């Protein structure tokens, strides 16, 4: 069992139940999955660069990424149907908790001028953020990076509101901006 999952089962569940007054233990929010995605439309023109970004995403996540393809052709963007334009990875279970632990304790402190993430979610218990650079991850070899590439990370929880979601993620170690 990962350190973060153990912390969740022993401490975080109890503090969430006390704070929000859940009557049933099944109401307590749980982290269901983490989705990491990269839009690689620019890199799609260069197969070596596209492959390099796929390798970086697999090193960051620990599993092989799914290549997302264009649904239809758009001549103005020089895009053909079926052409790879992105990649995504869905983390669940142990890998999800390990990634969350690494992201909170190793990666986010490496972000330049980091003062915390925004507390705004989607209103339905999910939280997303965008990173501008993949080089903040220690798994990425800086000498092999040909072009900086951003990514989107989405935390999907069973929380019903943004307050429940951000409280859960904050207790798990994600740092948010303090309200002024």
UniProtKB/Swiss-Prot annotation:
Keywords: Ribonucleoprotein, Ribosomal protein, RNA-binding, rRNA-binding, tRNA-binding. PROSITE patterns: RIBOSOMAL_L5 (PS00358). InterPro entries: Ribosomal_uL5 (IPR002132), Ribosomal_uL5_bac-type (IPR020930), Ribosomal_uL5_C (IPR031309), Ribosomal_uL5_CS (IPR020929), Ribosomal_uL5_dom_sf (IPR022803), Ribosomal_uL5_N (IPR031310). GO terms for cellular component: ribonucleoprotein complex; ribosome. GO terms for molecular function: rRNA binding; structural constituent of ribosome; tRNA binding. Coiled coil: none annotated. It comes from the Bacteria. Transmembrane segments: none annotated. Pfam families: Ribosomal_L5, Ribosomal_L5_C. One of its GO terms (biological process) is translation. This is one of the proteins that bind and probably mediate the attachment of the 5S RNA into the large ribosomal subunit, where it forms part of the central protuberance. In the 70S ribosome it contacts protein S13 of the 30S subunit (bridge B1b), connecting the 2 subunits; this bridge is implicated in subunit movement. Contacts the P site tRNA; the 5S rRNA and some of its associated proteins might help stabilize positioning of ribosome-bound tRNAs. Part of the 50S ribosomal subunit; part of the 5S rRNA/L5/L18/L25 subcomplex. Contacts the 5S rRNA and the P site tRNA. Forms a bridge to the 30S subunit in the 70S ribosome. Belongs to the universal ribosomal protein uL5 family. This is Large ribosomal subunit protein uL5. The gene is rplE.
């Amino acid at each position: 069992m990962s350190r973060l999952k153990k912390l969740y089962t022993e401490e975080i569940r109890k503090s969430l139940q006390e704070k929000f007054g859940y009557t049933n233990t099944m109401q307590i929010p749980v982290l269901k999955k983490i989705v990491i995605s990269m839009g690689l439309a620019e890199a799609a023109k260069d197969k070596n660069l596209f492959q390099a970004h796929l390798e970086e995403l697999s090193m960051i996540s620990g599993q092989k990424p799914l290549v997302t393809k264009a649904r239809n052709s758009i001549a103005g963007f020089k895009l053909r149907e079926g052409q790879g334009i992105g990649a995504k990875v869905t983390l669940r279970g142990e890998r999800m908790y390990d990634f969350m632990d690494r992201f909170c304790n190793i990666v986010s402190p490496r972000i330049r001028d980091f003062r915390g993430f925004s507390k705004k979610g989607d209103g339905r218990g999910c939280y997303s953020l965008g990173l501008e650079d993949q080089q903040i991850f220690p798994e990425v070899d800086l000498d092999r990076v040909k072009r900086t590439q951003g990514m989107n990370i989405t935390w999907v929880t069973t929380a019903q509101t943004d307050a429940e979601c951000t409280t859960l993620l904050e207790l798990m170690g994600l740092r948010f901006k303090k309200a002024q």
